[in-house]
């Protein structure tokens, strides 16, 4: 498959479902995982899209990812609930956690959902968008257990994960305002994408094993490993630390330290604490009008008319529209890794080639 090829989202979705069905996932599980991965690619976040498939296959083969498992309620207390993800697909465990949280927010006006011991839960904005679709504000603190890949401010090596932070605010007649990013300067998956493409990452994102700044993504993919840096120096580090505690410790999960280190980089275990709020609770009748007035005010001051000011979440909206029309781009290296993973789990070559022909058409 040539580099720069664009794939039809629906055909790619069918292929992903077939891959996970081949791995042993039940139909609904395969669909939920495919839904999430495709949605990440459509939103422009290829780091959390179908390029994760090889890592998931390795994690499953190593015994870290447990297929056909579900989140289990550990404790329920009114508007608060704690769930054990049971190392299930994060796309399943987080789906179940958000559904329960949204139900509780409808009932109580506010809900707090703590999920621990889940496999990789993917793009956090996806879960926030579910809350926004129900009319709710949500705040998400996420930690990555036992795979340190980010150095603290003034640190010499990795001490914690990329620890995403996410907030969404729903709007009645337009896309929700969405903040969703790793507390590292770039997501780890973006180093994987750059590595496959053979391109550097922006300056200020990485240090090598000796603590020397570099733009070479190989330092996060090949031994000896370097480290990601936090965004905005001490500010990103402080937010990452709070995500580690609120997402990890408060959820009933683990934080990253000597006793919790994982032996495999594919053993991606996430914890997430989510607060879901019905904005109607606050009795702010002018909230929507004030939000729109602010949005219009901010967007009215571009430095360059060819580079419009975007609201939080608007880039994803624009990218989603473009990729739904033109297809999902995928580089040759990533596609080869996905095909190799499909072969590893026993997908017949004729089935794989049939999908390749469909995707190439």
From Swiss-Prot:
It catalyses: 2-hydroxyglutarate + NADP(+) = 2-oxoglutarate + NADPH + H(+); 2-hydroxyglutarate + NAD(+) = 2-oxoglutarate + NADH + H(+); 3-phenyllactate + NADP(+) = 3-phenylpyruvate + NADPH + H(+); 3-phenyllactate + NAD(+) = 3-phenylpyruvate + NADH + H(+). GO terms for molecular function: (R)-4-hydroxyphenyllactate dehydrogenase (NADP+) activity; hydroxyphenylpyruvate reductase activity. It comes from the Bacteria. It is an enzyme of class 1 (oxidoreductase). Keywords: NAD, NADP, Oxidoreductase. The keyword Cell membrane does not apply. NAD(+) binds at residues 48, 122-124, 178-182, 234, 270, 313-316. Its EC number is 1.1.1.-, 1.1.1.237. InterPro entries: Mal/L-sulf/L-lact_DH-like_ah, Mal/L-sulf/L-lact_DH-like_NADP, Mal/L-sulfo/L-lacto_DH-like_sf, Malate/L-lactate_DH-like. PANTHER family: MALATE DEHYDROGENASE (PTHR11091:SF0), OXIDOREDUCTASE-RELATED (PTHR11091). Belongs to the LDH2/MDH2 oxidoreductase family. Catalyzes the NAD(P)H-dependent reduction of 2-oxoglutarate, phenylpyruvate and (4-hydroxyphenyl)pyruvate, leading to the respective 2-hydroxycarboxylate in vitro. Shows a preference for NADPH over NADH as a redox partner. Do not catalyze the reverse reactions. This is Hydroxycarboxylate dehydrogenase B. It comes from Escherichia coli O157:H7.
